[in-house]
């Protein structure tokens, strides 16, 4: 689930960090830049593990900061394909089940076609149901512990909203308030920069309580 990933980067050390020793200053800046952020095509960076190489610092004209080329290793959350993972159901929709690894990662989705054969969604209870036989129905309920298999990882280049897009959204929201409308302004929900797709289709998968 966690790997060590080797990364090279140019680190900027601002003057207010000069009181630190070089290694501490570099590690501090790297954690600010990478920790708890998605590294494209790598995974979710948890923390900086160690520094492998540190070159001499360079100064740029008109800038009091020091620039240092470094190679380091980072602890990265990146489950391998086929890995069996345990999480908690955070949401059920007609499209499938959203799973959270509490405090670590929330963008995990099990699509409806990756659930056990015969599973169906009940809007009244906001839950998925697996009918094992005519008399036994097993529920996928929110906040239940679920075991699943990693089938695919998805990286998306998510770009920040432009000033024009933000201006249009704010204007639409203001118009709604003036007209006394309570509905929220429709917004295009952007996909997460890194997401995992899972499956529950084999023995032992599904709610952990079923198999205890």
Swiss-Prot record:
One GO biological process term: transcription by RNA polymerase III
InterPro entries for this protein: NA-bd_OB-fold, RNA_pol_III_Rbc25, RNA_pol_Rpb7-like_N_sf, RNAP_E/RPC8, Rpb7-like, Rpb7-like_N
Any one Pfam family match given in the protein's UniProt record, by short name: SHS2_Rpb7-N
Region of interest: Disordered: 166-194
CDD domains per record: RNAP_III_Rpc25_N
UniProt keyword annotations, A-Z: DNA-directed RNA polymerase, Nucleus, Phosphoprotein, Transcription
Cystines in this chain: none
Modified positions (Phosphoserine) in chain numbering: 162
Cellular location(s): Nucleus
GO cellular component: nucleoplasm; nucleus; RNA polymerase III complex
Record carries keyword rRNA processing: no
Gene Ontology MF term list: DNA binding; DNA-directed RNA polymerase activity
Source species, domain of life: Eukaryota
Nucleotidyltransferase among keywords: no
Chain intervals with Basic and acidic residues compositional bias: 166-184
Family membership: Belongs to the eukaryotic RPB7/RPC8 RNA polymerase subunit family.
Described purpose of this protein according to its UniProt entry: DNA-dependent RNA polymerase catalyzes the transcription of DNA into RNA using the four ribonucleoside triphosphates as substrates. Specific peripheric component of RNA polymerase III which synthesizes small RNAs, such as 5S rRNA and tRNA. The RPC25/RPC8-RPC17/RPC9 subcomplex may bind Pol III transcripts emerging from the adjacent exit pore during elongation.
Note: Present with 752 molecules/cell in log phase SD medium.
Subunit structure of this chain's protein: Component of the RNA polymerase III (Pol III) complex consisting of 17 subunits. RPC25/RPC8 and RPC17/RPC9 form a Pol III subcomplex.
This protein's name: DNA-directed RNA polymerase III subunit RPC8
Organism of derivation: Saccharomyces cerevisiae (strain ATCC 204508 / S288c)
Source taxonomy: Eukaryota, Fungi, Dikarya, Ascomycota, Saccharomycotina
């Amino acid at each position: 689930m966690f790997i060590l990933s080797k990364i090279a980067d140019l680190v900027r050390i601002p003057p207010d960090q000069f009181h630190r020793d070089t290694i501490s200053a570099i590690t501090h800046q790297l954690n600010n830049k990478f920790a708890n952020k998605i590294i494209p095509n790598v995974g979710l960076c948890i923390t900086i593990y160690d520094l492998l190489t540190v070159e001499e610092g360079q100064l740029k004209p008109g800038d009091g900061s020091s620039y240092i080329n470094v190679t380091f290793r980072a602890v990265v959350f990146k489950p391998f394909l086929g890995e069996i993972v345990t999480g908690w159901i955070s949401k059920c929709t007609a499209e499938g089940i959203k799973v959270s690894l509490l405090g670590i990662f929330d963008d995990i989705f099990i699509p409806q076609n990756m659930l056990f054969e015969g599973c169906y969604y009940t809007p009244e209870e906001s839950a998925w149901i697996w009918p094992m036989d005519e008399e036994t129905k097993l529920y996928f309920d929110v906040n239940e512990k679920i075991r699943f298999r990693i089938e695919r990882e998805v990286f998306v280049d998510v770009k920040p909203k432009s000033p024009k897009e933000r201006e249009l959204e704010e204007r639409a929201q203001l118009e709604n308030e003036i007209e006394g409308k309570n509905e929220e302004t429709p917004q295009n929900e952007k996909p997460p920069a890194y997401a995992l797709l899972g499956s529950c289709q084999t023995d032992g998968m599904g709610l952990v309580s079923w198999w205890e």
